[in-house]
Amino acid sequence: MAVQQNKKSRSARDMRRSHDALEASTLSVEKSTGEVHLRHHVSPEGVYRGRKVIDKGADE
């Protein structure tokens, strides 16, 4: 088992952990359809920034 050579201070430990906090994902509402989707992602209907970018067929 690994053993540390020198003890890390509380400050060093907390500074390392400062980026570990969880954040809620940012959601956007599509203007044309009103759907909610992740930022910079295509909506489930295939619309991105008001334009149809994925043509979903009748079988899907």
Curated annotation (Swiss-Prot):
Alphabetical UniProt keywords: Ribonucleoprotein, Ribosomal protein
GO molecular function, one term: structural constituent of ribosome
Gene Ontology BP annotations: translation
Disordered: annotated span: 1-60
Biased composition (Basic and acidic residues): 11-22
A single GO cellular-component term on record: large ribosomal subunit
Family designation: Belongs to the bacterial ribosomal protein bL32 family.
PANTHER family the UniProt entry points to: 50S RIBOSOMAL PROTEIN L32, LARGE RIBOSOMAL SUBUNIT PROTEIN BL32
Protein name: Large ribosomal subunit protein bL32
Provenance organism: Ectopseudomonas mendocina (strain ymp)
